[in-house]
Regions:
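Conserved structural core of kinase catalytic domains
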Residues: 41, 55-59, 70-122
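Catalytic-loop of the protein kinase fold
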Residues: 134-144, 149
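Juxta-kinase regulatory segment immediately upstream of eukaryotic protein kinase catalytic domains
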Residues: 1-15, 231-239
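Activation-loop N-terminal segment of eukaryotic-like protein kinases
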Residues: 149-162
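C-lobe/activation-segment region of protein kinase-like
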Residues: 159-242
Length: 242
């Protein structure tokens, strides 16, 4: 076995830093770079061959979405290596960054709703999501927990720079041109904002306004807005029914 293969086939020196329903995330040094490893679980309830095939397809879709997002001008972690047999993606660890959810929790409250701060967040998220959707990239889990703010201090707030907003966790991402999928992606964001950041109820409307400004195909954007209203209505009906 070659030296790089030995390194690639174990987690020695990597620290488990997160675990979700689909994967474990490790942090360590790979080829001299601070690196994250995302390792997808085996699903024991599925047939082994089916599980292997579905997991490989999911990893390929995730990597494809990350690469396309970067090509669209959206900041994402760089992919270093992919090991389909080990169900792993080795990717860049983003330094000097804070999760957007934590940033909002720290900086914004009901008493101190800073328009400059909210406009900065709306400008960043609205622009980034418009870039993704304009290239038919559906994130699938667009929440403030899946956005990092990089190199942010008080001097940066109010000065939107594309690379300040880094989109992470493309585990549910796919490529799809339908207005329905884009509308649902937006609705997921709206629901997450209302749940996690009820102190800023107008944030989504600000994001949606910027999104419409930056979506490249204006005629399709009108269709997305219309479809979003339908999706929103369906969601409200489900909430009422329970």
């Amino acid at each position: 076995m070659l030296p790089y293969e030995k390194m690639f086939n174990n987690m020695n020196g990597f620290e488990l830093i997160a675990q979700g329903a689909e994967a474990r995330v490790y942090k360590g040094i790979y080829l001299g770079k601070l690196t994250l490893i995302k390792e997808r679980f085996e699903k024991k309830y599925r047939h082994a061959d089916l599980d292997k095939r579905l997991t490989k397809d999911r990893i390929k879709a995730e990597c494809r979405a990350i690469i396309r997002a970067k090509a669209a001008g959206v900041a994402t972690p760089a992919i270093y290596l992919v090991n389909l047999e080990r169900r792993c993606i080795y990717m860049e660890y983003i330094q000097d960054a804070i999760i957007l959810k934590d940033f909002i929790d720290e900086k914004v409250s009901k008493e101190t709703n800073d328009d400059r701060l909210l406009n900065f967040i709306a400008q960043g998220l609205g622009t980034v999501i418009a870039k993704l959707h304009s290239k038919n990239i559906i994130h699938g889990d667009m929440t403030t927990s899946n956005v990092l703010l990089k190199n942010i201090d008080d001097d940066h707030i109010g000065k939107y720079v594309a690379n300040n907003f880094v989109i992470i966790d493309f585990g549910l991402a796919h490529i799809e041109s339908s207005v329905e999928d884009k509308a649902v992606d937006l609705y997921v964001l709206e629901r997450s904002l209302l749940s996690a950041h009820s102190e800023v109820p107008l944030l989504f409307s600000k994001i949606f306004e910027i999104y419409q400004e930056h979506y490249t195909n204006k005629s399709q954007c009108k269709e997305i807005v219309s479809k979003y209203k339908e999706v929103q209505l369906r969601g409200r009906k489900r909430l009422m029914i329970g």
